[in-house]
Amino acid sequence: MWLAVNIGNSRQHWGWFTGTKLVRTLDFPLTHWDAQAPDAAEQIVVASVTTTHLERWRTLPHARILNLADVPLSGTYPTLGIDRALNLIAAADAYGCPALVTDFGTAITLSAVDEFGRFCGGAILPGLGTQLRALEHFTAALPAVDLPEPWPPLLARTTQAAIQSGVVRVTLAGLAQFLESWKRQYPGGISVATGGDSERVHRWLPDLFDVQDTHLTLWGICVAARGAD
């Protein structure tokens, strides 16, 4: 059994694989460390959007740190986040091309491959939770607000609900327009949602994306590791 580790901006995600079969996952804050878990894995493959949290992994002799050059994706640029590249090779492997992956994390990233599996660009904007925290941090009177569980009302009658409506409805309306434009440019392409907020977005708008795949990045690590063997 081997361990895939996806380190994001605020959380880390672990997936235990037997060969290419994902058998168990864990998700927790970056500050948490399960000292027993790495010892139970025959091999560890780590991908991180930042170098800050890699030091402890580098001390493990059976751990391999993935770089962008290890990801079999053409057309990339040097500062492309490895998570975006891994998402794309995972989507291409699991669902085919063209593909557009929207990753709902601290940032919302949209990344696309064409019909030949080549990276062809994308977009980045603040994540839903990041937008909510920014309003609290950068204004004098707006309160801290969590993401709503039900779909927020269009015309809210409280400040909290108005913030939720603005962040959620307007952000997802913009994403829907982006997806529509991409579908016109790439007819027959598949859109995939992943990331921490993707399950909630799927509950709100189940038809917005063709596929919701919580563990897409972990599968991308598996594809990259498989290609390197």
UniProtKB/Swiss-Prot annotation:
Name this protein carries in UniProt: Type III pantothenate kinase
Q: How is the cofactor bound?
A: A monovalent cation. Ammonium or potassium.
Q: What pathway is this protein a component of?
A: Cofactor biosynthesis; coenzyme A biosynthesis; CoA from (R)-pantothenate: step 1/5
Q: Which organism is it from?
A: Gloeobacter violaceus (strain ATCC 29082 / PCC 7421)
Q: What is the lineage of its organism?
A: Bacteria, Bacillati, Cyanobacteriota, Cyanophyceae, Gloeobacterales
Q: Where does K(+) bind?
A: D103
List the GO molecular function terms. Answer: ATP binding; metal ion binding; pantothenate kinase activity
Recorded hits in Pfam families, A to Z, give: Pan_kinase
Residue intervals passing through the bilayer: none
This protein's source sits in the domain of life called: Bacteria
Where do the annotations place ATP binding?
Answer: N6, I7, G8, N9, S10, R11, Q12, H13, T106
Give me the reactions it catalyses.
(R)-pantothenate + ATP = (R)-4'-phosphopantothenate + ADP + H(+)
Q: What does this protein do?
A: Catalyzes the phosphorylation of pantothenate (Pan), the first step in CoA biosynthesis.
Q: Which UniProt keywords apply?
A: ATP-binding, Coenzyme A biosynthesis, Cytoplasm, Kinase, Metal-binding, Nucleotide-binding, Potassium, Transferase
Spell out the family assignment given in the record's similarity comment: Belongs to the type III pantothenate kinase family.
Which Enzyme Commission number(s) are listed? 2.7.1.33
Q: Could you give a single Gene Ontology term from the biological process aspect?
A: coenzyme A biosynthetic process
Describe the protein's quaternary organization and the partners it interacts with.
Homodimer.
Q: Which cofactor does it need?
A: NH4(+); K(+)
Q: Which GO terms describe its cellular component?
A: cytoplasm
What InterPro entries does this protein's entry cite? ATPase_NBD, Type_III_PanK
Q: Where in the cell is it found?
A: Cytoplasm
Major location (coarse): cytoplasm
